UniProtKB/Swiss-Prot annotation:
Organism this protein belongs to: Bungarus candidus
Taxonomic classification: Eukaryota, Metazoa, Chordata, Craniata, Vertebrata
GO cellular component, one term: extracellular region
SUBUNIT field: Heterodimer; disulfide-linked. The A chains have phospholipase A2 activity and the B chains show homology with the basic protease inhibitors.
Protein name listed in UniProt: Kunitz-type serine protease inhibitor homolog T2 B chain
Keywords linked to the UniProt accession: Disulfide bond, Neurotoxin, Presynaptic neurotoxin, Secreted, Toxin
Amino acid sequence: RQRHRDCDKPPDKTN
C-alpha cells in the first residue's frame, strides 16, 4: 500500500 521507505525495511507490510 505505502512505499515511502520501501528500501529501508523489508517487504512485509510495504507491499
